[in-house]
């Protein structure tokens, strides 16, 4: 068994936990020491940002490391390899630019590749010069990247997403050893802006350990700050109660992360302290006012 091997057990073991056939989808079923590409994270976050009536309970699980998949068997948040896109499927740019795959160039009659991509073209299929559509697509790319980098677990990016790489709607470019798959490092202003945004986002995550806790959230105070380690709220500032987690009409959410209640210790055995954050998520196409909850207003 791989994870019992004296050499391999000391390495990072990461599974792509699906295969063809019955029983091939094994997300959440690998043993201790293994991390997994979390396909449920990908699907939930894609649906959330394209406005599907997904329950906020599903979003909450994925955003906090998928404890429903990994906690019961003793694994920790880093067991979840979070991703929006990978080598199979749309690039991030194409995820917000195409509703349908366009794999005709592969010579298989567009039958190859995944047909259900949970994508949204923002109003026009494929390339466009419409400034409103382009602006919305840029915002959606930022939404996906920000959610990925602020989620508990290990973020994984598809190379090229940081510069808006496109394969023109082809989501299965295994046979395209040409300009369709190659990287073009001559960046446009839009691509350079996305690269800069992504670099700053990664630096922000690295600077704030609250976004990469080594333990699960408890939903209560740990170190006596008087405030819970995580809180979930409606836009009006009221706390989400147990009966509302599975109400698909509740889409927008604010999340409080308490930087004074991190259970991790640093390399010297000292408590880790960070800033506290209130994160606002609004997947609708309308602006929305949020109220900072009274219970967290006095935290730093």
PLM ranges: what are they?
Residues 3-159, 164, 172-176, 209-212, ...:
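Conserved alpha/beta catalytic core and glycan-binding cleft of carbohydrate-active enzymes
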Residues 174-185:
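Acyl/amide activation-and-transfer machinery of modular secondary-metabolite enzymes
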Residues 183, 201-209, 284-300:
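C-terminal accessory region downstream of the catalytic core in glycan-modifying enzymes
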């Amino acid at each position: 068994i791989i994870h019992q091997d004296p050499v391999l057990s000391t390495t990072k073991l990461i599974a792509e936990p699906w295969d063809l056939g019955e029983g091939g989808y094994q997300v959440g079923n690998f043993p201790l020491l293994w991390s997994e590409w979390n396909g449920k994270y990908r699907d939930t976050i894609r649906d959330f940002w394209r406005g599907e009536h997904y329950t906020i309970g599903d979003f909450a699980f994925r955003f906090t490391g998928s404890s429903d998949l990994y906690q019961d068997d003793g694994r920790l948040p880093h067991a979840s390899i979070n991703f929006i896109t990978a080598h199979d499927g749309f690039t991030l740019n194409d995820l917000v630019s195409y509703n349908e795959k366009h794999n005709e160039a592969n010579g298989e009659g567009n039958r190859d590749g995944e047909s259900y991509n949970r994508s949204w073209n923002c109003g026009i299929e494929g390339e466009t010069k419409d400034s409103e559509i382009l602006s919305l697509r840029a915002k959606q790319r930022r939404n996906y990247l920000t959610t990925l980098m602020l989620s508990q677990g290990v973020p994984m990016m598809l190379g090229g997403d940081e510069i808006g790489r496109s394969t023109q709607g082809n989501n299965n470019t295994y046979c395209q050893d040409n300009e369709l798959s190659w990287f073009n490092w001559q960046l446009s202003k839009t691509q350079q802006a996305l690269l800069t945004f992504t670099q700053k986002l990664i630096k922000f995550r690295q600077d704030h350990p609250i976004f990469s806790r080594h333990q699960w959230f408890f939903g209560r105070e740990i170190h006596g700050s008087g405030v819970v380690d995580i809180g979930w709220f409606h836009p009006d500032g009221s706390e989400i109660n147990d009966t509302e987690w599975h109400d698909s009409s509740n889409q927008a959410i604010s999340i409080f992360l308490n930087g004074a209640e991190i259970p991790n210790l640093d390399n010297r055995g000292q408590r880790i302290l960070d800033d506290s954050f209130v994160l606002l998520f609004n997947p609708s196409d309308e602006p929305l006012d949020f109220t900072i909850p009274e219970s967290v207003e006095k935290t730093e």
